[in-house]
Amino acid sequence: ANHTPLLGSAGLTLKSYPYYDFDHHRLDFDAMLAALKQVPKDDLVLLHASCHNPCGADLSPEQWQQITHLAQERGFVPFIDMAYQGFGLGLAEDAYGLRLMAEVLPELLVAVSFSKNFGLYRERAGGLTLMAANEERARACQSQLLSLARGLYSMPPSHGSALVDIIWHSPDLRRLWQQELTDMRVRIQTLRQALHEGLKAQLPERDFGFIVRERGMFSFLGLTETQVTRLREEFSIYMTGNSRINIAGLSLARIDYVCDALESVIRA
């Protein structure tokens, strides 16, 4: 939801491409690929590295390979948003598509955020990496980025980035961070499994398998706005109007309550 106002305010002309099939709760890769085959040379194509926000449906390694080949063929430039590295399958696994494209393509943009995987949400720590085809293009892009930065914040705060730097350069702290990130990833996966099992028991006629197939914090439950409103007003369960739920906001102790509430509004 943030991409459209952010990129639009930068003066870019925006076009969307198909991605998520809401009816079947899955990535509509054929429709996505068909749309990307129409992208002109040098256009940017925004892609999520992993743990897609808002739907949780990620590209497979084979699909990343197809898009990489298409980028070579069409000449468009991938712009990869990596805000949840480590919450999907692992640090290396979640960066598969990014690393593949960096090896194969001449140009690439990568926006990385440490807000979630370092717990630095209020510090706004992150960075933009630009890979250019040659030194001349790299210098031109750097000049433009410096001009933009000067107009936005001039000198960014260093506290959050300094914390990331300390953790990365300390073997002990880095191991601890990796273990804590693993713990959080396993917690989210456990919550997904518990929610799926609870809903399967309460509503056996509906397929909630997408909950365990998807990755990261978010999934769409496929509810109507009326059902979402009832959950909020009658059960104090909050989610966005399109039924995007934050899996990480659940707890095992409250899964049964959530499943009971969902059964109530769905069967009404």
What is each stretch, according to the model?
Residues 14, 78, 108, 238-239:
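Hydrophobic beta-strand scaffold residues
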Residues 97-140:
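Active-site PLP attachment segment
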Residues 176-234:
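Conserved PLP-binding catalytic core of the aspartate aminotransferase-like
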Residues 142-161, 167-196:
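Structural signature of PLP-dependent enzymes
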Residues 1-12:
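Substrate-binding/gating loop at the entrance of the active-site cleft, primarily
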Residues 21-87:
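Active-site phosphate-binding strand-loop segment of PLP-dependent enzymes
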Residues 34, 136, 197-202, 223-268:
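PLP-dependent enzyme catalytic core of the Aspartate aminotransferase-like
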Residues 10, 73-74, 104:
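Helix C-cap/helix->beta junction micro-motif
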